[in-house]
Design a protein with these regions (language model features):
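Active-site beta->alpha loop and helix N-cap motifs at the rims of alpha/beta catalytic domains
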Residues: 64-122
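Anionic-ligand binding region
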Residues: 151-168
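Conserved small/polar residues in nucleotide/adenosyl-binding loops
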Residues: 175-180
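Active-site mouth loops of central-metabolism enzymes
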Residues: 16-27, 93-104, 148-152
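Conserved, mostly hydrophobic/aromatic
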Residues: 47, 113, 161
């Protein structure tokens, strides 16, 4: 069973911590992950630094810039996760942008995720209609594709996302009124 599915098998609240790989220095990722877990993190997202992180806010954009200046690479991130896996079974997801995965090749990326025991992959810029094969290939390796929905996502699209996603769907909240939660929570399928 995928560790993400196992984690979310209970209804308790979960603490998911995001860490940009290679920030504040190239070799700090492992220590930051292990300290986050000691501090109570139930799951870790490791951000893959990218030169144009348009879906991220200014803090993560700056962390990406520093990590890239530090010289972190996707291959090094996989090696760091392998080292982390020697010390913990906490679920780990990679979060990034599709361009570095395309450059590596999707099959090679998925193989490296599997080899490093990555549990999930989040790619906010991968268009849903272009993600079917990629998501299915992830699921074939027991890796959860983690897809996103927003308050303005249509019912039809939510159903498509829930069928394609793995064991977790991200609900992006917009700062609107009435409560963003009320705008979409009632529309989410009870099980994906």
């Amino acid at each position: 069973m995928n560790r993400i599915k196992e984690l979310f098998a209970t209804d308790s609240k979960k603490l998911i911590v995001f860490i940009t790989a290679g920030f504040p220095n190239k070799d700090s990722t492992k220590n930051l992950v292990l300290e986050a877990i000691k501090g109570g993190a139930d799951m870790i997202e490791i951000g893959i630094p990218f030169s144009d992180p348009q879906a991220d806010g200014p803090v993560i954009q700056e962390a990406n810039e520093i990590a890239l200046k530090n010289g972190i690479t996707l291959l090094e991130i996989f090696e760091q996760v392998k080292e982390i896996r020697k010390e913990t079974d906490v679920p780990i997801a990679l979060m990034g942008y599709y361009n570095p995965i395309l450059r590596m090749g999707t099959k090679d990326f998925i193989k490296k995720c599997n080899d490093a025991e990555i549990d999930g992959v989040i790619l906010p810029d991968l268009p849903l209609d272009e993600s079917v094969e990629f998501c299915n290939n992830l699921k074939n390796k027991n890796i959860s594709p983690i897809l996103l929905v927003a308050p303005n996502t249509s019912e039809k699209r939510i159903k498509k996302i829930s069928k394609l996603a793995g064991d977790l769907i991200y609900a992006c909240l917009l700062y609107t009124s009435p409560s963003p939660r009320d705008l979409w929570i009632s529309r989410m399928p009870s099980s994906a």
